[in-house]
């Protein structure tokens, strides 16, 4: 089974109050899992990576063998594809964690989309931020 993992993260202020959200869907659109979490004060990029790490962990837990990660973070997608280097020391640990999880899963692809194509994960992030 191939699944799509929609991830998002956001910070109000950069850094500022931050949260992430993810939605894991089966190929037919059935939601396998979704989650959002406030992570305190962080940058937008830390929030984006936190959502990716949490979503990959859930995919492993559910034994999903193949995942397409869908994100509106061009930086994160290009870093995970190896197109951009991770220059920020603050992101390096999260990048390494995401990379280890992706290798554990096996087949992971990354696709960058516009925010409008990532609405559900974005909504989860904003709900988590509004609740604080």
Per-range role (PLM):
Residues 1, 131-132:
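Generic structural signal for short, solvent-exposed loop/turn connectors between secondary structure elements
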Residues 1-46, 50, 54-65:
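RNase H-like nuclease fold core
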Residues 10-14, 53-131:
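RNase H catalytic domain
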